[in-house]
């Protein structure tokens, strides 16, 4: 029998950490929809590079217009404040070789440090914006701020859209066939922790990658 429920949080769903269900929707812990993760780089008010692990995003557009929509950006974060001030940011996709670097970008985000360097990455100059890119990234999207929207009035998070002004793709990644393009050296996915909907018990999450099932087109 399927688990069926309305939008009201189940009574047996208790927070694993303070503010959990203020920042994240409880349904996310049932749906467990995987999402690609990346490092977004921005510039702090004094021009020092900022780097932060992000996800909860989609990529869309038409013709010569390509956009990134970040839907879980915390309003109090350095990333959001920097984008609002400078109107620029860069999306940097990195492989699973850099999982430890990802963690460092979360745990060590002090105001007075170069977070790209501190996370173990190398900076390189972007070609359309002032924000630096991460050299180790196999796919970089240089973006300018387009718009933002609260999905819920007075929300903790903001949904933000950026227009991609310039793309930089690793030669091997860009030329590979689909059978070779996705794997250990490619996109990393966050498989978020879940909740047992019947007991409220926490189920551990993880990190994943794409496994090609069939070479075909839809």
Task: Mark where each language-model region is.
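Basic, polyanion-binding surface patches
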Residues: 1-218
